[in-house]
């Protein structure tokens, strides 16, 4: 499979694409939007489900993550062929505008010139989702929001003041902290972290016709915010389907060849990439030194150098230090690049004794493979995993406290729940519901007179 790189910054449309569109009798074009690696992994089961039903599926990649490790291998891994590469570039504000502009033109063409009704599937809380939905909505096409209403729940200022004051006095009680995080009343919902994703997910909701909620908690909060119940369905999370696919390929994983000193060891698997953690020096130094303390205390640590954490290590002058750690702690420390294949990631985290991350999707994956998770944030946009006792936040303020929280979590049996939260056959549930809605409504965009079915009362006579 070839994934074209468009060096002239133009939009790429695969050969014969428009011919194929013109020669199909299908009425709806199911447009799967992807960009980041988690996007691809979680949208892959939907793409495959629609393909298996012989629906007209169009895979649109924004093009911003065409680094081989971030995109190409995982596309090939799931058998996904890109139809349209929007090939966006430049800084983040330019990327926002380019997605809207280029997808807009594509949607107008597929609708006006080829008479296909676009049904865009946007995922999660990404820049791709919050721009693709605008291109659709402004052309009177509503979207299917996969993993809808992802909100961060953060313990209050009072809760954290109490935590840090007690820790400074030597009175930290891990068991009490772990239990206190189960109290739903301690949480606030106004965090802008992860940034800018918490803006993105909120900005998508008004363009959405079908909310594919990953857990019941989000169904309740969507209804609380005023969205109609009949447009919301708890379908669980497509990551569960993706993991089932990847488990079948783990036999071919070479992950432990890349990190041989972790094989058969009680290691922790670490990834850090969030902007607020890597672009804010104080926070990254706290996180880095928490990891360093774990290494120096002879905990087995596998730390993946993602693009953002690599940037931070260089930007804050830590490159020599991490190289010294690699040399001094060869037995218990591994540091290397991101794993290209999802099956390799699942192979490693399923054998880890804990996952330490600031990633939302990895919190879910840890829950599914029955491994304790420690989230290096102040709150979580996967609060359901905390309330299910399988995840604990380690706020990036005090390195020693963070390291202590991680040590308590390693292979903690209380944090292993073999009834994971995200079920199975999720993509089937989503496609079933979308096709049912299309059959009933024929399109996923309606003004109020249509939505309220008031057409029989129209009367423009004087």
Regions flagged by a language model, labelled:
Residues 1-304, 308-462:
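Nucleotide-activated sugar donor-binding and catalytic core shared by glycosyltransferases
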């Amino acid at each position: 499979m070839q994934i074209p790189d468009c060096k002239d910054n133009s939009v790429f449309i695969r050969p014969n694409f428009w011919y194929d569109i013109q020669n199909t009798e299908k009425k709806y074009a199911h447009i799967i939007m992807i960009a980041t690696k988690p996007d691809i992994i979680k949208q892959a089961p939907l793409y495959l489900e629609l393909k298996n039903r012989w629906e007209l599926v169009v895979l649109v990649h924004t093009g911003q993550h065409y680094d081989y490790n971030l995109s190409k291998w995982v596309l090939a891994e799931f058998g996904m062929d890109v139809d349209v590469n929007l090939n966006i570039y430049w800084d983040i504000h330019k990327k926002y505008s380019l997605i809207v502009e280029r997808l807009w033109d594509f949607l107008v063409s597929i609708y006006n010139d080829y008479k296909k009704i676009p049904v865009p599937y946007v995922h999660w809380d990404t820049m791709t989702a919050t721009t693709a939905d605008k291109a659709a909505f402004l052309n009177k096409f509503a979207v299917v929001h996969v993993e809808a209403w992802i909100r961060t729940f953060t313990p209050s200022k009072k809760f954290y003041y109490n935590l840090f004051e007690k820790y400074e006095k030597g009175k930290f009680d891990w068991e009490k902290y772990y239990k206190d995080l189960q109290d739903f009343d301690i949480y606030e919902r106004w965090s802008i972290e992860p940034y800018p994703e918490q803006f993105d997910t909120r900005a998508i909701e008004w363009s959405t016709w079908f909310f594919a909620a990953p857990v019941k908690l989000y169904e309740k909060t969507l209804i609380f915010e005023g969205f109609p119940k009949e447009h919301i369905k708890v379908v669980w999370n497509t990551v569960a389907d993706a993991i089932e696919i990847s488990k079948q390929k783990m036999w071919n994983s070479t992950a432990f060849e890349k990190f041989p000193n972790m094989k058969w060891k009680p290691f922790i698997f670490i990834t850090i990439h969030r902007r607020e953690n890597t672009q804010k020096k104080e926070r990254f130094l706290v996180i880095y030194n928490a990891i360093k303390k774990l290494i120096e205390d002879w905990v087995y640590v596998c730390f993946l150098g993602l693009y953002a954490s690599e940037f931070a290590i260089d930007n804050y002058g830590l490159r020599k230090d991490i190289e010294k750690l690699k040399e001094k702690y060869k037995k218990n420390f591994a540091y290397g690049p991101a794993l290209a294949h999802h099956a390799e990631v699942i192979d490693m985290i399923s054998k880890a004794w804990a996952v330490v991350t600031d990633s939302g999707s990895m919190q879910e994956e840890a829950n599914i493979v029955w491994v304790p998770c420690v989230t290096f944030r102040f709150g979580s946009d996967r609060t359901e995993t905390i309330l299910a006792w399988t995840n604990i936040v380690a706020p990036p303020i005090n390195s020693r406290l963070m390291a202590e929280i991680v040590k308590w979590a390693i292979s903690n049996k209380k944090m292993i729940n073999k009834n994971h939260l995200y079920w199975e056959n999720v993509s089937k549930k989503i496609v079933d519901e979308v096709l049912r809605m299309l059959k009933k409504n024929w399109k996923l965009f309606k003004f109020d007179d249509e939505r309220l079915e008031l057409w029989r009362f129209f009367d423009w006579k004087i």
